[in-house]
Curated annotation (Swiss-Prot):
Coiled-coil ranges per UniProt: none
Stated name of the protein: Sodium/iodide cotransporter
Gene: SLC5A5
One example GO MF annotation: sodium:iodide symporter activity
Organism of this sequence: Homo sapiens (Human)
Record family assignment: Belongs to the sodium:solute symporter (SSF) (TC 2.A.21) family.
Length: 643
C-alpha cells in the first residue's frame, strides 16, 4: 500500500518490457509459421478463409478474441469498479447473441458459401445496397480499430509514462506484418495465443489482489457493504447506464450486430469445415467471452476493495477511470519485476487480435465487393498479391486514423460500443429485412439504413456534446477519506493535492446548465448500449413501411437460399479443394449439365445465377435441402456438396 499512500508515479521496468517484447515475438512467429505452412496461400479464398478447412476450437477462440480488445481489458474493470458486478449481465447478452447467431444468421451465410457478408445484400436486393453496407462497414471498422490501437497506448502513457508512439508503432507494424503475410490462418492462431495471454493476465491480477486485501470473504464483504454486488438491478429507466435490461436488450443487439452480420466474425465461422463445426465454434466463443468478461469484472471488484476509501481518481493519481487497471497492476506488483509486463502483454494481446481481425476483414470486403466485380479475369495469384497489399494499406491507415479516437469522450469502452452500435446497428437491421421479411425491397432497405444511421448518430453526437451526469448514469459512490486522513496524520497539514476535487459521494449540484438543450437529460442521456438497438429498430420499421408503400417484393421472385424461412434442417459441409473428387453423386455438376438455355462454353464454371438456379432445382426435385457454394462469380472455383 506504500505506493497508494505516497502518490509516486509507478513505471514499467526492464523485465516488464522484456515480457511484452516476448509476447510480440511469439505472436509474430506463430503468424508467420501458420500462414506460410504448406506453401502459403494459393488464392484469395485461402488468404481470407484459410481454405475453409479450419477447426472449431481455434475459430471459436479467435471469435472471442476479435472484439475482446485492450478496450475491454482496460474498460470492463473500470466500469465494474464504478457501477458494480451487474456488468456480469453482459455475459447473458453475449449468450443470447451466440444462440441467435447460430440459429438465424450463420446457416444462411454458411450455406451460401460467401466470403463477403455484403455479397448477400446484392443477391437479395441490389448492388447499391451492397456498396452501402461495404462502405458503412469499412468506416465503422476503421474508427473502432483506431480506438483499439490508440486508447490503450494513451492510457498507459498517462499512467506509467510508456512511450505512446513506440507502443503504437510496435504493435501496429507487427500486427500488419503477420496479417499481410499469413492471412486468416495467421490471424486465427495468433488469436488463440493472445486469448491465453489475456486470461493469464487477468487471473494473475485477481490472485494477487485477493491475497493482498485479505481473501475472497473480505472482497465479498466490502463489495457488498459498498453496493458493488448489485446483480438485481431491474430499473427500466433507459438512462441508467447499466441495468439488467440494458445488457439483455441493448447489449444483445450490439453483440448481434458484431457477431451475426459483421464481416470479421462471419468470415471466421464460414471458414469452418462444416456447419456443425461452425456452430461448435460459436459455443466455444461463448465460453471464451464468459471467461474474459467475468474475469475482467471480478478484477474491477477486487480493484475497488483494494482502493476502498482511497480512490486514486479522487486523489488525482489518475485522470480518467480507464486508468484504474494499469495503476492497480503497478501498485500490487511493484516488488515483482516482470509480472506487470504480463498485464502489458495482456492489454496489447487484445489490441493485436482486434486489429489483425479488422485488417483482414477490410481487405476481404474490398477484394470481394469492390475489386472482383470490376476485374473478373484476375488470376488467383494476382488476387493474393492484391489482398496482401490491401492488408498493408489498411494497417497503415489504422495507425494513421488512431489519433482521431482521442476525440471520443466517456471512456474507451463507451467509445468502442458507440461506434459499433451507431454504424453496425442499422446494418443488422438491413440483414434482418433481407432474411426475415420477404416483402422488403431495395428502396425500403436503403431508406431504412439512412433513417437508422441518422437517428443513432444523432443521439450519439448529442450524448458526446452534452454528456449525462454521474447521477443520471447512477455511478456508485467512492471516497478518498482514508488516504486524506493518513496524509493529515503523518504531517499535521493537509496537502491540497490530496483534496478530493470530484468526490463521487457528494450530493449533486442542484443548479441547471441553461445552455443544455431539453433533450440533453432525456433522449441524449439514454445508455450507450441502446444506440445499436435504436438503429436496428428504426431500420427495420422504416424499411418495412417504405417497402409496403413502394410495392413489396413478391416472395416467388426471390432465389432460394436467401430467406431464413426456406432453410432445410440439414447442416452443410464445405469441402476443401482436394476433397471435391470424393464427394457424393448429388453434387451440382459442371456446365455440360446445365439446361440448354444456361450452357456455358467449355472451361467456364457456373456463375452466381447458375448457382441459384440449381438451388431452386434441388428444392423442386424434393432433395429436402439445398446446396452450398464456395467461391465467387465468373470463373471462380466451385466446391459444393449436399447439406
Amino acid at each position: 500500500m506504500e505506493a497508494v499512500e505516497t502518490g509516486e508515479r509507478p513505471t514499467f521496468g526492464a523485465w516488464d518490457y522484456g515480457v511484452f517484447a516476448l509476447m510480440l515475438l511469439v505472436s509474430t512467429g506463430i503468424g508467420l509459421w501458420v500462414g506460410l505452412a504448406r506453401g502459403g496461400q494459393r488464392s484469395a479464398e485461402d488468404f481470407f478463409t484459410g481454405g475453409r478447412r479450419l477447426a472449431a476450437l481455434p475459430v471459436g477462440l479467435s471469435l472471442s478474441a476479435s472484439f475482446m480488445s485492450a478496450v475491454q481489458v482496460l474498460g470492463v474493470p473500470s466500469e465494474a469498479y464504478r457501477y458494480g458486478l451487474k456488468f456480469l449481465w453482459m455475459c447473458l447478452g453475449q449468450l443470447l447473441n451466440s444462440v441467435l447467431t447460430a440459429l438465424l444468421f450463420m446457416p444462411v451465410f454458411y450455406r451460401l458459401g460467401l466470403t463477403s457478408t455484403y455479397e448477400y445484400l446484392e443477391m437479395r436486393f441490389s448492388r447499391a445496397v451492397r456498396l452501402c453496407g461495404t462502405l458503412q462497414y469499412i468506416v465503422a471498422t476503421m474508427l473502432y480499430t483506431g480506438i483499439v490501437i490508440y486508447a490503450p497506448a494513451l492510457i498507459l502513457n498517462q499512467v506509467t509514462g510508456l512511450d505512446i508512439w513506440a507502443s503504437l508503432l510496435s504493435t501496429g507494424i507487427i500486427c500488419t506484418f503477420y496479417t499481410a503475410v499469413g492471412g486468416m490462418k495467421a490471424v486465427v492462431w495468433t488469436d488463440v495465443f493472445q486469448v491465453v495471454v489475456m486470461l493469464s493476465g487477468f487471473w494473475v491480477v485477481l490472485a494477487r489482489g485477493v491475497m493482498l486485501v485479505g481473501g475472497p470473504r473480505q472482497v465479498l464483504t466490502l463489495a457488498q457493504n459498498h453496493s458493488r454486488i448489485n446483480l438485481m438491478d431491474f430499473n427500466p429507466d433507459p438512462r441508467s447506464r447499466y441495468t439488467f435490461w440494458t445488457f439483455v436488450v441493448g447489449g444483445t443487439l450490439v453483440w448481434l450486430s458484431m457477431y451475426g452480420v459483421n464481416q470479421a466474425q462471419v468470415q471466421r465461422y464460414v471458414a469452418c469445415r462444416t456447419e456443425k463445426q461452425a456452430k461448435l465454434a460459436l459455443l466455444i466463443n461463448q465460453v471464451g467471452l464468459f471467461l474474459i468478461v467475468s474475469s475482467a469484472a471480478c478484477c474491477g471488484i477486487v480493484m475497488f476493495v483494494f482502493y476502498t476509501d482511497c480512490d486514486p481518481l479522487l486523489l488525482g493519481r489518475i485522470s480518467a477511470p480507464d486508468q484504474y487497471m494499469p495503476l492497480l497492476v503497478l501498485d500490487i506488483f511493484e516488488d515483482l519485476p516482470g509480472v506487470p509486463g504480463l498485464f502489458l502483454a495482456c492489454a496489447y494481446s487484445g489490441t493485436l487480435s482486434t486489429a489483425s481481425t479488422s485488417i483482414n476483414a477490410m481487405a476481404a470486403v474490398t477484394v470481394e465487393d469492390l475489386i472482383k466485380p470490376r476485374l473478373r479475369s484476375l488470376a488467383p495469384r494476382k488476387l493474393v498479391i492484391i489482398s496482401k497489399g490491401l492488408s498493408l494499406i489498411y494497417g497503415s491507415a489504422c495507425l494513421t486514423v488512431a489519433a482521431l479516437s482521442s476525440l471520443l469522450g466517456g471512456g474507451v469502452l463507451q467509445g468502442s460500443f458507440t461506434v459499433m452500435g451507431v454504424i453496425s446497428g442499422p446494418l443488422l437491421g438491413a440483414f434482418i429485412l433481407g432474411m426475415f421479411l420477404p416483402a422488403c425491397n431495395t428502396p425500403g432497405v436503403l431508406a431504412g439504413l439512412g433513417a437508422g444511421l441518422a437517428l443513432s448518430l444523432w443521439v450519439a453526437l448529442g450524448a458526446t456534446l452534452y454528456p449525462p451526469s454521474e447521477q443520471t448514469m447512477r455511478v456508485l459512490p467512492s471516497s478518498a477519506a482514508r488516504c486524506v486522513a493518513l496524509s493529515v496524520n503523518a504531517s499535521g497539514l493537509l496537502d491540497p493535492a490530496l483534496l478530493p476535487a470530484n468526490d463521487s459521494s457528494r450530493a449533486p449540484s442542484s443548479g441547471m446548465d441553461a445552455s443544455r438543450p431539453a433533450l440533453a437529460d432525456s433522449f441524449y442521456a439514454i445508455s450507450y448500449l441502446y444506440y445499436g438497438a435504436l438503429g436496428t429498430l428504426t431500420t427495420v420499421l422504416c424499411g418495412a413501411l417504405i417497402s409496403c408503400l413502394t410495392g413489396p417484393t413478391k416472395r416467388s421472385t426471390l432465389a432460394p437460399g436467401l430467406l431464413w424461412w426456406d432453410l432445410a434442417r440439414q447442416t452443410a459441409s464445405v469441402a476443401p479443394k482436394e476433397e471435391v473428387a470424393i464427394l457424393d453423386d448429388n453434387l451440382v455438376k459442371g456446365p455440360e449439365e446445365l439446361p440448354t438455355g444456361n450452357k456455358k462454353p467449355p472451361g467456364f464454371l457456373p456463375t452466381n445465377e447458375d448457382r441459384l438456379f440449381f438451388l431452386g432445382q434441388k428444392e423442386l426435385e424434393g432433395a429436402g435441402s439445398w446446396t452450398p457454394c464456395v467461391g465467387h462469380d465468373g470463373g471462380r472455383d466451385q466446391q459444393e456438396t449436399n447439406l
